[in-house]
Amino acid sequence: MANRLAGHLDQLVSPNQSAFIKGRFILDNFMLVQHTTKFLHQQKQPRNLMKLDITKAFDSVSWPFLLEVLKYLGFGPIWRDIICGLLASSSTQILLNGSLGNKIAHRRGLRQGDPPSPMLFILVMDILCAMVKKASEEGLLQPLATRAL
């Protein structure tokens, strides 16, 4: 399933996303940020640069939202049911003093180590990027106008 999804990510996700997508390199985004900050520093004008801390975002993905994203992107009901089954079957057990506790069912988030999880996360994050872009287009955020970086 992860391999089938990976083969289509480059068509589903905007070019701004580079992690976990074949043919794209996450280092490109680091270089873009480095060049952008250098450019801003050289301009010597007050500017803001937004960085989002997504440290816990993987664990807080809303399942209903993810399923709506998949539906919006054209994933059929069978695919969505499979993903829903993967999500609903995830649980955690805590080992304390050698005893394994009861299972704790997850209600949100993506299972780390599950092959499709990074790709599903990218699909959700792409919606966030689209929202930031729309806010910029509507004048709520000011885009950075630069020459070639």
What do these predicted ranges mean?
Residues 1-149:
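Nucleotidyl polymerases of mobile genetic elements and RNA viruses
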